[in-house]
């Protein structure tokens, strides 16, 4: 997994920079392919936005196997066999982790971007604008919120789970619950983080969807559960009721990925039973068991 390269001398997890940061060009049907995982919160963001904006015919997608091995993400029945092959085809000297999401240019045979924070913004501004997830009137506020979510929650749960020092771990956990407390107050008075559904809601949802089943126990963010926050829990369930959210949420793949793949935290690879959470009406089985690769 090469995670040791991202642990500082004081035991702090410092996420690697994204290697490929070119902006997505105009949409061209058949040219770009998204490699994503239902298990990964960063990748699920892009899957949600792709579905919300109706970009299925413009951005092809390949779903990788949720169980990552020593070679990285495997592409079931695919060519290449492993995502790492695309990274080395683009940069033969690449030495970092092989991450999803990434966008492959099928014409030029290279990875255009694995810059997960920017991919959704590019789709929202250059590929589709209905619904408008990044409205100009809210962009400064959305940017501020996204930054707060990243440092206080989205990445902070990883800083807690991957930390190698007690104080570093406790500092990360404190940030997580300070952020959740702030969001609980905000969402007690609002349906969304702003007066309309935005990119920020997508970024928050993918962390909330994993919180009780993974981050609470596996990453030791165990002060409170999502279900202990009435407003946040109701908000998460409202978003889950939207097809783009529940069709891209696979709780089984999420749990198996973290508990089986991250053996430095869970060497037994035992996947816990539960928790039993009522997310509301389940989507049709066909939506939850999509083929690994779709055109």
Question: What is each PLM-predicted segment?
Answer:
Residues 1-295:
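C-terminal alpha-helical interaction module
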């Amino acid at each position: 997994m090469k995670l040791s390269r991202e642990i500082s001398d004081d035991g702090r997890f410092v996420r690697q920079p994204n290697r490929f940061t070119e902006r997505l060009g105009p949409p061209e049907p058949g040219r770009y392919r998204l490699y994503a995982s239902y298990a990964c919160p960063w990748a699920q963001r892009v899957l949600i936005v792709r579905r919300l904006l109706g970009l299925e015919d413009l951005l092809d997608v390949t779903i990788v196997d949720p169980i990552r091995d020593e070679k990285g993400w495997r592409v079931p029945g695919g060519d290449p066999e492993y995502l790492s092959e695309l990274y080395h085809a683009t940069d033969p000297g690449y030495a970092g982790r092989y991450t999803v999401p990434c966008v492959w240019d099928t014409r030029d045979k290279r990875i255009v971007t694995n810059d997960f924070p920017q991919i959704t913004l590019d789709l929202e501004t250059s590929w589709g604008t209905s619904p408008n997830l990044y409205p100009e009137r809210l962009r400064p506020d959305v940017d501020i919120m996204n930054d707060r979510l990243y440092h206080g929650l989205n990445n902070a749960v990883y800083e807690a789970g991957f930390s190698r020092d007690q104080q570093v771990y406790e500092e990360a956990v404190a940030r997580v619950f300070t952020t959740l407390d702030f969001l609980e107050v905000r969402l007690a008075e609002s349906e969304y983080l702003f007066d309309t559904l935005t990119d920020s809601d997508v970024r928050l949802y993918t962390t909330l969807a994993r919180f009780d089943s993974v981050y609470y126990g596996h990453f030791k963010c165990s002060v409170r559960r999502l279900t202990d926050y009435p407003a946040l829990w109701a908000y998460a369930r409202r978003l889950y009721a939207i097809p783009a959210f529940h069709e891209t949420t696979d709780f089984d793949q999420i749990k198996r990925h973290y508990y089986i793949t991250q053996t430095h935290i869970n060497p037994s690879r035992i996947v816990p039973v539960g928790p039993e959470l009522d997310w509301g009406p389940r989507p049709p089985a066909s939506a939850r068991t999509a083929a690994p690769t779709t055109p």
